[in-house]
């Protein structure tokens, strides 16, 4: 019997892609394939690609070309495969298979077919699959953190975004399925679950006829996981019911990732997000009133077609006014297949880059000021790494999401994968510094009156 080939994975892109990669690893391992972290030693490399913006495509193509030039057999999975299947098959003879964004559960069958000499194109025209708790999964995050996908796909048609074309219509998992997987992850020692989808506040709309995020959060409150974090919360979906569920569910962090994209009503209308322009300020103010300790992250696009200096200043003032904890800014990238690619009055590349840099410069003193407000506080920190040269522990407090926000550098003994209480001693623009709290610190904290 011929031995099965050894497989390595090259993961690119977002956390949704990461979950797809984790399921493919789990399925192949269950089927008896060897998984090697070293691409040089593997017989086949599965590259799970990203195609969200031009820079992501370029990174994906560079990775594919480097592997092809080294003589590797390649399976191209993910968004680039979904987007450019014909070109990839024509231009990369080393590609033995393509796997679409809704087809990763077929990876074992795909590999088996390639072993018999077939060149496989496993891409569904309309992605419709979503994994549940029964599909094997091998996590690639640190042991204490897991992403938990609640839905896949998107029914919105923002002018700049290719995601609905690449990932299909929204399809939500059942509450029972999500809670079951959360319990599995808790049993593995996970301390933090990060809820993800394209629009998490729309969770359940397709399945139940109405958004059900509030009910899902309350159900997850019964799972033995200390931290539950919400990503991709659209502002108009933050209803009083959702805000109440965040406030009243003990393990749901008051951390919200709000993909606002812009502030000016004219640009939001051009982005096909006209509903947002008149509610941004009001929703953020209501959030801060209802959740005084809320940590707010958002992302913006600089240089969208038609963006004038007036529009740009409006966005800059919006950032200054609301003092977000974390801000990411992308220069607009025109994407084939989106409405924005044909919009008039494109902004020159050098202006887009300059505006992006200016927005980040606007945010930096705000971020540093908000971080420095943590100095002297006792906070829980999830310890994830040990610095190889200094021995400092590296973790995150509740105000930092994995991969996209800052970290906390911690002096003192602390076990990896555990929450420890840390006194914050210093801060900079992106990170905090602290030391493991002493018994005296903890005693003094216990004597303080509750501020709740």
From Swiss-Prot:
Binds 2 [4Fe-4S] clusters. One cluster is coordinated with 3 cysteines and an exchangeable S-adenosyl-L-methionine. [4Fe-4S] cluster 2 binds at residues 154, 158, 161. One of its GO terms (biological process) is tRNA modification. It catalyses: L-aspartate(89)-[ribosomal protein uS12]-hydrogen + (sulfur carrier)-SH + AH2 + 2 S-adenosyl-L-methionine = 3-methylsulfanyl-L-aspartate(89)-[ribosomal protein uS12]-hydrogen + (sulfur carrier)-H + 5'-deoxyadenosine + L-methionine + A + S-adenosyl-L-homocysteine + 2 H(+). Residues 372-438 form the TRAM domain. Residues 140-369 form the Radical SAM core domain. It comes from the Bacteria. It is an enzyme of class 2 (transferase). Keywords: 4Fe-4S, Cytoplasm, Iron, Iron-sulfur, Metal-binding, S-adenosyl-L-methionine, Transferase. GO terms for molecular function: 4 iron, 4 sulfur cluster binding; aspartic acid methylthiotransferase activity; metal ion binding; protein methylthiotransferase activity. Residues 5-116 form the MTTase N-terminal domain. Its EC number is 2.8.4.4. Its cofactor is [4Fe-4S] cluster. SUPFAM superfamilies: Radical SAM enzymes. PROSITE patterns: MTTASE_N, MTTASE_RADICAL, RADICAL_SAM, TRAM. GO terms for cellular component: cytosol. [4Fe-4S] cluster 1 binds at residues 14, 50, 79. Catalyzes the methylthiolation of an aspartic acid residue of ribosomal protein uS12. Belongs to the methylthiotransferase family. RimO subfamily. This is Ribosomal protein uS12 methylthiotransferase RimO. It comes from Synechococcus elongatus (strain ATCC 33912 / PCC 7942 / FACHB-805). The lineage of its organism: Bacteria, Bacillati, Cyanobacteriota, Cyanophyceae, Synechococcales.
